[in-house]
Amino acid sequence: MIRADLATIPTYVPGRRLVDATKLSSNEVSFSPLPAAVDAVTEATWGANRYPDMGAVELREALAEHLEVEFDQVTVGCGSSALCQQLVQATCAQGDEVIFPWRSFEAYPIFAQVAGATPVAIPLTADQNHDLDAMAAAITDKTRLIFICNPNNPSGTTITQAQFDNFMEKVPNDVVVGLDEAYFEFNRADDTPVATEEIHRHDNVIGLRTFSKAYGLAGLRVGYAFGNAEIIAAMNKVAIPFAVNSAAQAAALASLNSADELMERVEETVEKRDAVVSALGAAPTQANFVWLPGEGAAELAAKLAEHGIVIRAFPEGARISVTNAEETDKLLRAWEAINAG
């Protein structure tokens, strides 16, 4: 009754929760949604007896203006993760290949396998960045899609413009490159590709961003993709009907129109991020988290949990979200306590 290959597909593991603990395991912001977004959600719920606008026309129009693209070059989905899955479904058939860095966003291989495609994971370099040369070398006649996570989750590293340009010279025009910029608003790298520019240089590049992180709408699930109109149309074709609810659309639109207020919050996170990097001796990061590679992540997570701090432990290292001043102070006090002995 059940597909036999599902037994081999890993289950997505969300960040851990503990009652009364400070949750730094899911790269969420600690701020509530912007006031305008809260008001928009309240208003939208009065129409919850009606289906949402399946085409999300008003939101897509605003995004098109924001991104400086045409209306048919942008779509929205139930978080950028859903759009990643739609991109796989739109490009891959049984036996096709999806290339991605590893470790990176852990849903990439899941989405590939669910679609019947073959996941091709390329290990990060020693400095925890994309090995773009190895990713290019892995391209075969079965490759249909390549994900680049910039900044990368969980390492927080970014690639340079020259690295991306060199990589794209090796990518066939019929292979789609998904430039996943879920942490775009936190990125302060001077030399790195930006999807809004790359989609005009390459017809096979699709940008992917979200309202879940910097915008503080993780609980409402809304993201957006932009680029080649033909690819966007194909992504819409495989989307779940009415996936982005009315409240999510309203909140995203209101948040998009409150950019100045949003960036004030983001700057606080960036400031605290740099302080955490210094205190923990972590490598520089361009996201709202720090990455501590190496063994012992589970042990570190257990010790911090004893002090009311929940982080994310991976086999390759520990990822710690950075939020606001109050939660950063709690983290640093806990860090000092476990290292005092």
From Swiss-Prot:
Q: What are the recorded Gene Ontology BP terms?
A: L-histidine biosynthetic process
**Catalyses which reaction(s):** an aromatic L-alpha-amino acid + 2-oxoglutarate = an aromatic oxo-acid + L-glutamate
Query: Keyword Transferase: yes or no?
Result: yes
Q: The organism sits in which domain of life?
A: Bacteria
PTM N6-(pyridoxal phosphate)lysine: list the residues: 213
GO MF terms here are: aromatic-amino-acid transaminase activity; histidinol-phosphate transaminase activity; pyridoxal phosphate binding
Q: What does this protein do?
A: Aminotransferase that catalyzes the conversion of aromatic amino acids and 2-oxoglutarate into corresponding aromatic oxo acids and L-glutamate. May catalyze the transamination reaction in phenylalanine biosynthesis.
Which PANTHER family does the UniProt entry name for this protein?
HISTIDINOL-PHOSPHATE AMINOTRANSFERASE (PTHR43643:SF3), HISTIDINOL-PHOSPHATE AMINOTRANSFERASE 2 (PTHR43643)
What is this protein identified as?
A: Aromatic amino acid aminotransferase
